């Protein structure tokens, strides 16, 4: 079954799986990219040199409240060919986004003012908040064939769930308006708890999209498959090849 999922996605994206990973800060976006690369991408890169180089480009991820990603990062820089189960060839690249700011997160301010960050989309440095906003739109619209939104119940960072709600609403609304296929991952230390089941149900009703709860730090091949299958179902039926990707910053 796994091959079929990747084969179907490859047909719909001309073989380019460019994944924009977006969401509020401190939800686990860099961790998702690291696990995805370690689990699905690195083992399927045939060229040793490219495998090592790709490994070096995987973003740092950390626990706690401090923001790790302060500028958008393409991982790997030019996309890399992988072959799944020796049958499906794909070109994969992920984009780690600057997230929308969450109350309680640290690292986006200096001397009480918002930090200025540099981005590929502007010669001028811009505030963290603006970088998150422009970056999310740009990454999904121009540099992704599919989107993954990472949200959390707060158990992975110790930041209150309530602090995440407004930025989470913004990012999901943004993705819906951009009309790219996407999936929503709920990052939690307790994916199978009753509380998580209730939260999932609430969020699915609120956003009208499937929510996949998992502990992203422990994400395995089966979890990735579930995410990709959810994305696949979000492609419009019969619109094979529509999700083309403009390669310009």
Residue ranges: model-predicted function:
Residues 170-183, 188-246:
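Canonical P-loop GTPase G-domain recognition
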Residues 19, 93-95, 145-149, 183-185, ...:
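Hydrophobic/aromatic beta-strand patches that form the interior of the parallel beta-sheet core
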Residues 1-123, 141:
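Conserved G1/Walker A P-loop phosphate-binding module
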Residues 105-158, 174:
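Inter-motif core of Ras-like GTPase G domains
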Residues 104-107, 158-163, 193-197:
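Conserved ATPase-coupling elements of RecA-like P-loop NTPase cores
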Residues 98-102, 153-156, 189-192, 217-220:
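Conserved nucleotide-binding/hydrolysis micro-motifs of P-loop NTPases
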Residues 163-169:
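Charged helix-capping and loop-helix junction motifs
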Residues 40, 44-52, 101-105, 140, ...:
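Conserved NTP-handling cores and scaffolds of large molecular machines
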């Amino acid at each position: 079954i796994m091959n079929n999922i990747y084969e179907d996605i490859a047909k719909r994206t001309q073989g380019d799986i460019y994944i924009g990973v977006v969401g509020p800060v401190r939800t686990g976006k860099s961790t998702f990219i690291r696990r995805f690369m370690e689990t699905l991408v690195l083992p399927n890169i045939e060229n040793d040199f490219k495998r090592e180089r790709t490994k070096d480009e995987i973003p740092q991820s950390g626990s706690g409240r401090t923001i790790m990603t302060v500028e958008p990062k393409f991982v790997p820089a030019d996309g890399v060919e992988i072959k799944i189960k020796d049958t499906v060839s794909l070109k994969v690249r992920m984009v780690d986004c600057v997230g929308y700011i969450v109350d309680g997160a640290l690292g986006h301010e200096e001397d009480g003012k918002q930090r200025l960050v540099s981005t590929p989309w502007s010669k001028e440095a811009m505030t963290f908040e603006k970088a998150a906003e422009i970056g999310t739109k740009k990454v999904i619209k121009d540099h992704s064939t599919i989107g993954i939104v990472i949200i959390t119940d707060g158990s992975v960072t110790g930041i209150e769930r309530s602090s995440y709600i407004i930025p989470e609403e913004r990012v999901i609304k943004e993705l819906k308006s951009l009309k790219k296929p996407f999936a929503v991952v709920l990052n939690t230390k307790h994916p199978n708890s009753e509380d998580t089941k209730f939260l999932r149900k609430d969020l699915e009703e609120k956003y009208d999209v499937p929510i996949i709860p998992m502990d992203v730090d422990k994400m395995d091949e089966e979890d990735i498959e579930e995410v990709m299958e959810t994305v696949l179902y979000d492609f419009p039926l019969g619109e094979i090849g529509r999700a083309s990707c403009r390669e310009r910053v």
